[in-house]
């Protein structure tokens, strides 16, 4: 283990973090930056324990049809399980030299509870309060989850949770000294078969709104930009949305991997059609091309070496689709532009909910009952969704469902 004090705490010790943020930090370390990550598992201590047993060393293999490349990662120097280790985590965050909390906890983690230790935002509020009590130096809290405006969402929930501590000075400190830059991350990382070897694609991207953390992460491929929004929307609407579509098709057709689904010309065309319509809903960042980006996404998904399972991508649709599809349809309706392929995507989701015996979703019971009844209006009017879908879309979704 390197003799470097932990200065980054990562909430969400999954395969994605280990094949993405930890790789960027490793490359920064290789370039001479004094960085070290403590990574936190919040659901199951098994991953934390396995990484510790491996001496906090593992291999990331970048692979495509033409070649593969291995990289040893040692940027994670400690692992913990929350809530068991919350006191140790508080000590880490309270250290004067601590820099940032980063997060990959999936969309469903962004909830509020009046039990401070029950949710991700509450836990972050608690850790920040422990820092506030020891030092008033600010830090960054960087959400890397697939939420548009993830920094603002995180800040709002952390501030709401902070009110539970009845410390007005702390709330003001969070507002003025804790930074919540928006960020966008991208890399296809399937669930690993071996915790010591993560297989991923050569492509990797991390875009962060301008922040002092740039001092440590510049020069290793992290992009610091004035506005992340365009990059977020490209990823959510041109990549994540079609990834979901392919996953539901795969589950319905009994096709194990999304690369096999997109290998079918009719599904490849469907993906292209979704991307074409979605691209009309927003403006891409300067220097980017929606058509080139979309084509690159199709090629990346088709990578046959990744083994990315339809079942893995299909889970938690109620948490993903509002951000990936609902907002897009709403904006296309406002612009009086066609959205039939996106309506078809949602119809396929409803069909999957009605027919699959492998639905894994926090709203599964409600969704399945409504999907089996083909109650499109009832399903998409549920108050549980983070984004309300414009009811003007219901008729189109029903028509697409009838045509499946």
Functional labels for PLM-detected ranges:
Residues 1-404:
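Substrate/ligand-engaging "lid" and interaction regions
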């Amino acid at each position: 283990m390197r003799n470097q004090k932990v200065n980054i705490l990562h909430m969400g010790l999954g395969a994605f973090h280990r094949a993405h943020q930890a790789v960027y930090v490793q490359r920064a370390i290789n370039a001479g930056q004094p960085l070290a990550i403590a990574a936190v598992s919040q659901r199951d201590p098994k991953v934390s324990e396995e990484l510790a047993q491996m001496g906090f060393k593992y291999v990331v293999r970048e692979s495509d049809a033409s070649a593969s490349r291995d990289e040893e990662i040692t940027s994670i120097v400690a692992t913990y399980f929350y809530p068991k280790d919350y006191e140790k985590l508080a000590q880490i965050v309270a250290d004067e030299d601590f820099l940032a909390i980063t997060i990959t906890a999936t969309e469903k983690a962004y909830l509020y509870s009046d039990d401070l230790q029950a949710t991700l935002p509450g836990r972050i509020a608690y850790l920040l309060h422990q820092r506030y009590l020891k030092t008033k130096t600010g830090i960054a809290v960087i959400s890397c989850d697939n939420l548009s405006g993830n920094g603002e969402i995180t800040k709002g929930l952390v501030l709401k949770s902070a009110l539970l501590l009845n410390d007005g000075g702390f709330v003001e400190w969070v507002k003025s000294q804790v930074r919540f830059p928006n960020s966008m991350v991208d890399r296809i990382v399937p669930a690993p078969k071996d915790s010591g070897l993560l297989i991923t694609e050569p492509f990797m991207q991390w875009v962060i709104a301008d922040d002092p953390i740039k001092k440590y992460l510049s020069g290793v491929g992290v992009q610091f930009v004035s506005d992340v929004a365009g990059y977020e929307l490209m990823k959510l609407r041109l990549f994540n949305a079609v990834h979901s579509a392919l996953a539901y098709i795969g589950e319905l057709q009994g096709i194990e991997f999304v690369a096999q689904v997109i290998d079918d010309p009719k599904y490849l065309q469907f993906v292209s059609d979704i991307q074409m319509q979605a691209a009309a809903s927003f403006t891409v960042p300067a220097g980017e091309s929606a058509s080139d980006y979309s084509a690159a996404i199709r090629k990346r998904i088709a990578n046959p070496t990744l083994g990315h399972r339809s079942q893995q991508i299909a889970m938690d649709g109620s948490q993903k689709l509002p951000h990936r599809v609902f907002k897009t349809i709403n904006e296309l309706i406002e612009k009086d532009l066609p959205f039939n392929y996106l309506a078809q995507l949602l119809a396929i989701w409803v069909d999957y909910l009605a027919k699959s015996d492998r639905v894994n979703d926090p709203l599964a019971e409600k969704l399945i009952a409504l999907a089996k009844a083909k109650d499109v209006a009832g399903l998409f009017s549920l108050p549980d969704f983070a984004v309300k879908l414009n009811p003007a879309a219901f008729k189109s979704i029903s028509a697409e469902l009838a045509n499946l």
